[in-house]
Curated annotation (Swiss-Prot):
UniProtKB keywords: ATP-binding, Ligase, Nucleotide-binding, Protein biosynthesis
UniProt-listed SUPFAM superfamilies: Amidase signature (AS) enzymes (SSF75304)
Protein name: Glutamyl-tRNA(Gln) amidotransferase subunit A
Pfam name, any one: Amidase
EC number: 6.3.5.7
GO molecular function: ATP binding; glutaminyl-tRNA synthase (glutamine-hydrolyzing) activity
Sequence similarity: Belongs to the amidase family. GatA subfamily.
Subunit structure: Heterotrimer of A, B and C subunits.
GO CC aspect terms: glutamyl-tRNA(Gln) amidotransferase complex
Length: 483
């Protein structure tokens, strides 16, 4: 069963080849057997999953249901879920259970999806390797001494290891696309505002965006159909009609203009990555696409800009965790100040503290203009680069990550090297554009991801390009040994 894609599983459920309960039990057994070593799940909701599966079977038996009714899924542990704890990978929320479901969770539940559990992640989504989690590092299924990427590393590893057909993720600077690339799956970051952020614990509110992580573009399209749409409870949600993303999957890509930024193919790119990426681009050329060279001149400013804007927003968002209302509270504080200091000092991990300190510094009275205001101006320039480029081409392509998955612990003591792992993804978030990563080959036996970036609300085109590529390649069907 676990070798089938989400779309294939949905067809099999409709044809009564097996029940949702049988399918759910199959995945729960795989999680029980394989997760202890992989560490991709923080919480497995066995009883609730089987209860939801039985309800889905009743709907399917009546001939009703959506395109994903009865399909087991996993949620990144950043989405609030009633009855199941939401930790955000942090000691601060180790015992927190939300009183409501995130919009993404409720929409998928209403559509009949079954929640297997909550996946591991970098603490408060801050990290590129899934090593900052309070619950320990996630291992890459392709090589257990390598990182799965972050911050949605648990979701990516679980999908790659076939512990779940698909999962939800969030992307603030590459946190869906980078782990998707490193684990050899498909991951889509929608346009900012396309998917509701209600109930998604905030890191950097102007950058955060939820999206699907799955084996194929078709699977991602099926999930996005349900996840996308306006939500009045999210002030940044966009009131724009949601198309059926599956309808455009089979369209011809002949004549589509693909731009290759010169800045994405410079000396920073690992040679092992360049070879499969160039081969993938040639495949698109064979499918009828036109390839053009373009420039995104402010690419090198993206990382420093992001690491002013994101920590500033993080500092503001995480100020709510003070030990007085919810979350971790220190024992026996002497006074209110000690309650604040010790609760935050003991509840947050080192990377989260680092970003809070950076954010507080750049927002301080003496440095606001020098750092934060300047970063917002640079953000506009980065966005303008994309705006200009996308008047010349339909989509932009390049590598998702400059290197394959690196070793666990390799960059833990070098935060700048870790931050540079997102050099090709961060600028997309700063501009609010949609982008996806698809498997495009291997380097040193490890997966390589191809990133496709589009204009605002062009998810249909991105999924169409990805699907057509996956029809003529089999990288997305490769499975790690032992899984």
């Amino acid at each position: 069963m676990h070798h089938k894609s989400l779309a294939e599983l949905a067809s099999a459920l409709k044809a009564r080849e097996f029940s949702s309960e049988e399918l759910t039990q199959h995945y729960l057994k795989r999680i029980e057997r394989l997760n202890e070593d992989l560490n991709s799940f923080i919480t497995v909701s066995t009883e609730e999953a089987l209860k939801q599966a039985k309800a889905a079977d009743a709907i399917l038996q009546s001939g009703e249901g959506s395109s994903i009714t009865g399909i087991p899924l996993a949620h990144k542990d950043i989405f609030c879920t009633t009855g199941v704890k939401t930790s955000c990978g942090s000691k601060m929320l180790d015992n927190f259970t939300a009183p409501y479901n995130a919009t993404v969770v409720s929409r998928l539940k209403t559509a009949g999806a079954v929640m297997l559990g909550k996946t591991n992640m970098d603490e408060f989504a801050m990290g590129s390797s899934n090593e900052t989690s309070f619950y320990g590092s996630v291992k890459n299924p392709w090589a257990h001494d390598r990182v799965p990427g972050g911050s949605s590393g648990g979701s990516a590893a679980a999908v790659a290891a076939r512990l779940t057909p698909a999962a939800t993720g969030t992307d603030t600077g590459g946190s869906i696309r980078q782990p998707a690339a490193l684990c050899g799956i498909t991951g889509l970051k929608p346009t900012y505002g396309r998917v509701s952020r209600y109930g998604m614990i905030a890191f950097a509110s102007s950058l955060d965006q939820g999206g699907p992580m799955a084996r194929t573009a078709q699977d991602a399209a099926l999930l996005l159909n349900v996840m996308a749409g306006f939500d009045e409870r999210d002030s940044t949600s966009v009131a724009q009609d949601v198309p059926d993303y599956t309808l455009s999957l089979e369209e011809s890509i002949k004549g589509i203009k693909i731009g290759l930024p010169t800045e994405y193919f410079d000396e920073n790119l690992n040679p092992g990555i360049a070879i499969p990426i160039e081969a993938a681009i040639k495949e698109f050329e064979r499918l009828g696409a036109q390839i053009r060279e373009i420039s995104l001149p402010n690419t090198k400013l993206a990382v420093p800009t992001y690491y002013v804007v994101a920590p500033a927003e993080c500092s503001s968002n995480l100020s709510r965790y003070d030990g007085t209302r919810f979350g971790y509270r220190c024992d026996n504080p002497k006074d209110l100040l000690e309650l604040y200091c010790r609760s935050r000092g003991e509840g947050f991990g080192p990377e989260v503290k680092r970003r809070i300190l950076i954010g507080t510094y750049v927002l301080s009275a003496g440095y606001y203009d020098a750092y934060y205001l300047k970063a917002q101006k640079l953000r506009r320039l980065i966005s303008d680069d994309f705006k200009q480029a996308l008047t010349e081409v339909d989509v932009i392509m390049g590598p998702t990550s400059p290197t394959p998955a690196f070793r666990l612990g390799e960059k833990s003591d070098d935060p700048v090297a870790m931050y540079l792992a997102d050099i090709y993804t961060i600028n997309v978030n700063l501009a609010g554009l949609p982008a996806l990563s698809i498997p495009a080959g291997f380097a040193q036996g490890l997966p390589v991801g191809l990133q496709i970036i589009g204009n605002y609300f062009s998810e249909s085109r991105l999924l169409n390009l990805a699907h057509r590529y996956q029809q003529v390649t089999d990288w997305h069907d490769r499975i790690p040994a032992g899984y």
